[in-house]
Amino acid sequence: MHGRRHVLVGLILAADAALFPASVQADNFGRVRYDRQTDRLVVTMLYRGTNPGHTFSLKWGECQTGQSGGLPGVNAEVLDDQFNDPEEQDFQKSVRFSLKGMPCPRPATITLRTAPRFFYTLTIP
């Protein structure tokens, strides 16, 4: 019985390695902060590609009321204009996102998201 279980676990791990290579990365966040003077988010983006010239933008979701803490909240998807760029080198870039298009009244909670699973939440006064 134990032998079959070990074979099954080995097959699952081999299939996982074949379908999801270790080199697959996604855009992620380094430092994230709110700049009160310019009313912008300052985000250090960590990403892989063939060049450092990626451009990032925000796609706002709908404002959600009734969040924990009593503040309205919104999800903002961070989009990479070169999301299909082959992942050859590591890069980082400091990006400033304007909050003019934020659909929630302030103060509010913003959750930044990148595909497939990275997120960062902060409160904007």
What are these regions (language model features)?
Residues 113-123:
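Short acidic/polar inter-strand loop motif in beta-rich domains
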Residues 56-80:
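The feature marks short-to-medium sequence segments in extracytoplasmic or secretory-pathway proteins
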Residues 77-109:
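Short, solvent-exposed, Trp/other aromatic-anchored flexible loops in extracytoplasmic proteins
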Residues 27-64:
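Short, surface-exposed binding/anchoring microloops in extracellular/periplasmic proteins
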Residues 4-8:
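N-terminal export leaders
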Residues 36-38, 51, 64-72, 101-106:
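A short, structured loop/turn motif at beta-sheet edges
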Residues 10-18:
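Bacterial N-terminal signal peptides
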